[in-house]
Amino acid sequence: MVIDKQILDELTAQAKASPRLRMNMDLRNSQADLSQRILNAIEPGTVLPIHRHLNSSVTIVCIRGHFEELIYDEIGTLVEAIDMIPGGNVINLPIGTWHSIRSLESGTVLLECQDGPYEPHKEGDVLKI
């Protein structure tokens, strides 16, 4: 599969039409894959809760647009905001890092990769502040 402008535009259109202002495309071969590879289209105004992954590090690359990767401490204090643009930073978040994302430009799409099959966030993995 070539991830071209048409695919990115279609994913962005779905994100814009979604009440959550985001949409993802699963790039795995099957649910049995032992890794996750997901394209995420995120629009300004989408709310991603501060969360962590206790079983995997997470690698994040900006494919198109502009966003900030937000890193927090365990009580919800913002520790770092990392500017993400295509050809810029690539992030590898260690296991257990509290983080979120803020979209700064319409049409933003990122690639997120992590170990293991998809698991919804558990109660203790979403920071309540």
Q: What is each stretch, according to the model?
A:
Residues 1-35, 80-84, 129:
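A short, N-terminal "cap"/entry segment at the start of jelly-roll beta-barrel domains
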Residues 38-54:
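Conserved short histidine dyad/triad with adjacent acidic residue
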Residues 49-51, 69-70, 91-93, 99-104, ...:
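Short beta-strand His + acidic residue motifs that chelate non-heme Fe in jelly-roll/DSBH
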Residues 55-74:
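Glycine- and acidic-residue-biased ligand/ion/polar-headgroup-sensing regions
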Residues 46, 55-56, 97, 106:
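A generic "binding-loop/recognition-motif" signal
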Residues 3, 7-11, 19, 75-77, ...:
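Double-stranded beta-helix
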